[in-house]
A protein has these predicted regions:
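Short beta-strand micro-motifs in enzyme catalytic cores
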Residues: 2, 66, 226-230
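N-terminal auxiliary segments of SAM/dcSAM-dependent transferases
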Residues: 1-61
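Conserved SAM/SAH cofactor-binding pocket of Class I
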Residues: 78-158
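SAM-dependent Rossmann-like transferase core, predominantly class I methyltransferases
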Residues: 37-97
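Hydrophobic anchor at the start of a short beta-strand
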Residues: 24-27, 125, 215-218
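A short helix-to-beta-strand connector/capping loop
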Residues: 24-25, 48, 64, 123, ...
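S-adenosylmethionine
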Residues: 130-234
Length: 236
């Protein structure tokens, strides 16, 4: 399944393109609002020491250091999904304990985790996504927050970037990709990790795997026994 996004009504143009091809026709039309696409209205929220605001509600005249502004565009990352919220809470836990100087955000979406990590003081953050729309959206949000010197967006497969040296690895991503990530020895060279996008049965699979590896699970979030987020540390 594929989606095309338009900034204005475009049915006539689409119909014209369809008419140029044989064997193709429009079967149905469903109009979805921007809020429906994201699963609800996008509004400000606060987690830990930061306030997250969509760009259309942020002040360009007076921003304080606790503000992170973002535009999710049409990619995942409105901030309201429970996996995003719990990942941000996990980040707060890490930075309450120590400073992190390098991090990788795999499946960055709109870049919220990367933005927060850099705002906490992390000097080098690699924000990776296979979706080019996510990369361009993240780059926009990086510039909006003046974090160009700290975050580098990259279009690539998540598992191809696990080997890049970093103290922290974050991955809020499909479970099939997570499985490939944790199967790599390079994963266990990190100091901290945050994994999310995990369902109940998948969490138990990961927990059993980590019992055989040098991993200490610091905290687990399991909102409604549906979505799980794991904050873990590699034991050297």
């Amino acid at each position: 399944m594929s989606f095309l996004f338009f900034s204005k009504p475009s049915l006539s143009e689409v119909q014209h393109l369809v008419n140029l091809e044989t064997g193709i026709s429009i079967l149905d039309v469903f109009q979805m609002s921007y809020a429906e696409w994201h699963g609800g209205q996008i509004s400000p929220f606060s987690i830990g020491r930061f306030h997250y605001k969509p760009v259309w509600e942020a002040s360009y005249i007076q921003r304080d250091e606790s503000e992170i502004v973002f535009d999710p565009g049409v990619v995942f990352g409105s901030g309201w999904h429970v996996t995003t919220i719990t990942c941000l809470e996990a980040l707060e836990r890490i930075f309450q304990q120590e400073n992190i100087s390098s991090a990788i955000d795999l499946g960055t979406g709109s870049g919220l985790l990367a933005l927060a990590t850099a705002k906490y003081g992390c000097q080098r953050v690699l924000a990776v996504d296979l979706n080019p729309l996510a990369v361009s959206t993240t780059w926009f949000n990086i510039r909006e927050n003046g974090l160009e010197s700290r975050i580098m967006p990259c279009q690539a497969k998540a598992e191809d970037n696990v080997g890049i040296p970093a103290e922290l690895l974050m991955a809020n991503i499909h479970y099939d990709v997570l499985q490939r990530i944790v199967a790599l020895e390079e994963f266990y060279l990190k100091k901290w990790f945050i994994l999310s996008g995990i369902l109940r049965s998948q969490f138990f699979e990961l927990r059993e795997l980590f019992r055989t590896r040098p991993v200490h699970i610091e905290e687990v979030w399991n909102e409604g026994q549906v979505w799980y987020t794991i904050l873990g540390k590699i034991v050297s």
